[in-house]
């Protein structure tokens, strides 16, 4: 893909994200600058938003929760996340190419 926020390192996918916690539903929103914006329902308290983000991404990419690693931004809305060997690309990413 020609989107700046998607990079591959071997079989792993690296994503630069901006997170919107306390949303009404979990979803990919779109691009915000060079970051992918994701809305999740969990509040940004006691790591709940990070745990929920990992659960959401693991379902979207069809990988185990342990295959989602937040490399940077544990205490920030701006994150760098590694998806180890994603089994499936979410439908949302197809719309980024259009």
UniProtKB/Swiss-Prot annotation:
Pfam families: DUF167. One of its GO terms (cellular component) is cytoplasm. InterPro entries: DUF167 (IPR003746), YggU-like_sf (IPR036591). SMART domains: DUF167. NCBIfam families: DUF167 family protein (TIGR00251), PRK05090.1 (NF003466). Belongs to the UPF0235 family. This is UPF0235 protein Ping_3043.
